[in-house]
Amino acid sequence: MKPVILSGPVLKERTTLRLGGQALAEVRLDDMHAFDGLPRVLERLGGTPAVLGRGSNILARDGELPLVIINPALKAEPEAWADPQAEDRVLVRVAAGVRLPVLLGRLAAQGLSGLEGLAGVPGTVGGAVAMNAGSYGNDMGSVLSSVEIFSAGTGMICVPRSQCRCEYRHFSVPAAGGWFVVAAVTLQLRRSTATAVRDAMRSNALLKKKTQPVTEHSAGCVFKNPADGISAGRLLDQCGFRGRGKGGMAFSSLHANFLVNKAQGTSDDAMDLINDARHAVERATGHYLELEVKIWPWQ
């Protein structure tokens, strides 16, 4: 199957923060064979490649954007088999386009433990790996066994966890030599019971609903927590940014590290709030807050 090319996708319609102008094109990859034609398609279209799943950690700028969106839309059913190296472990291969909540539902039904903390986190499996998404003590890197990636320099390769860099909200594959697309991942999970896994997921999801604006248009946490372990949300709280807004954008009144689109906000409003918060926190506490949300185009 060849890549499917869509003209002029509007990122406001493709990101959970509901911001963003029009990209040059979107290249949708519906199966593994479609990756073969990707380099030629990108060369013909021009622009900067940008990989997009559900757009749940993206702040896209308004206006015309020199981006070609790559959408790894593979959604084959997860496959599971016993780990030959560990009796209490199960390996699960998942396509990048599978939504994270769908995967968690499958894991709960099979009593497979390791990602309960990500209950309530939106996005796709590929996107979760690409940013090493994590919550409540779990992250994708901690259960990653291998990842199948495509890059212009390598083609499709399977990379073991030992050859990946999994850091706090960061994931990279040095062998890729530049941009790459996650096509599928294999996770190593612990055997548990369906009841225990479901109960943990339910508890984590309920806690998120109480403490995070999960029903509003947001892109998750704006800033990473500083390396000394202090919460970025607490620093923003101390500096008076909980609930502070500009135009249609505001820091959530429920959790200060979430930026929400209240009413037709703009990317300029969002960037002004982010820059104001960064400067205020650095002046008051000495902490320079590093972005967790991805700004498109990159700065």
UniProtKB/Swiss-Prot annotation:
Pfam families per record = FAD_binding_4, MurB_C
Subcellular location(s): the record lists:
Cytoplasm
Spans through the membrane: none
Outline the extent of the FAD-binding PCMH-type domain: 19-192
Q: Which family does it belong to?
A: Belongs to the MurB family.
The record's section on NCBIfam families has: murB
Name it.
UDP-N-acetylenolpyruvoylglucosamine reductase
Starting at the broadest rank, the lineage of the source organism is:
Bacteria, Pseudomonadati, Thermodesulfobacteriota, Desulfovibrionia, Desulfovibrionales
Q: Which gene encodes it?
A: murB
